[in-house]
Amino acid sequence: MSPKLFSITEKEQLKEKMFLSGLELLKEYGMTHMSVEKIAASAGIGKSTFDNFFMSKEDFVLQLIGFNRMRFWKAVQDMLGGREKLTIAESKQVLTMIINNKDSVYQYLTPENEEKLAAASPDGNKLDIDEETDTLRRLFGYFEGVRGDVDFGVVSNLLKILALTAENKTILHESAYDRTQEKLFGLLFGCVFKEGENE
């Protein structure tokens, strides 16, 4: 029996189906216990079809992260609704969404998982301040009231601290977690928005 040939549209639809079902498996099992077989079965395909799209489970998760990035930018465009800029309140929602999004892959990864992903990534998941600055500049270009003197390194680090806090929530005092997050977001907003406009 010859292998099924997919059109470009079918390939994209199938990949999206695998990403969405794989994300749910990641939430349920974590990366360690999420197998290629489980991903294939949940998407209604065979393992050999999965292997035509991805080199490994790690490759799948790296591409899932890229897929989520595309969904994030689409969500920003949807919020804009044809406008040039988001209000400060909407901009704060976007920054909060980066951290508190239930579909963020990072919160379901362990440090060991992240090491495996770094090893599987072509660039070793190297931190690149120029690339991060470009991404933040692009994002802040859609925000009203952004400071003229944004320190992109500090903002990037604050976003990482917020992400690490969310990922390691279990080692923090649960009763103070929301208040801690509020304080950290307050600091972040103060670094992004002009004085008097970050309320």
Where would I find each of the regions flagged by the language model?
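An amphipathic alpha-helix adjacent to DNA-recognition modules
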Residues: 12-20, 32-33, 53-77, 81
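Short hydrophobic/aromatic patch on the recognition helix
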Residues: 44-54
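Amphipathic alpha-helical segments used for helix-helix packing
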Residues: 90-126, 168
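Hydrophobic alpha-helical connector segments
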Residues: 63, 77-104, 159
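C-terminal peripheral helix-coil segments that are non-catalytic and often amphipathic
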Residues: 1, 141-145, 161, 165-199
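Basic, helix-initiating cap at the start of DNA-binding domains
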Residues: 1-29, 38, 42
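Hydrophobic/aromatic residues within well-ordered alpha-helical segments
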Residues: 14, 57, 64, 68-72, ...
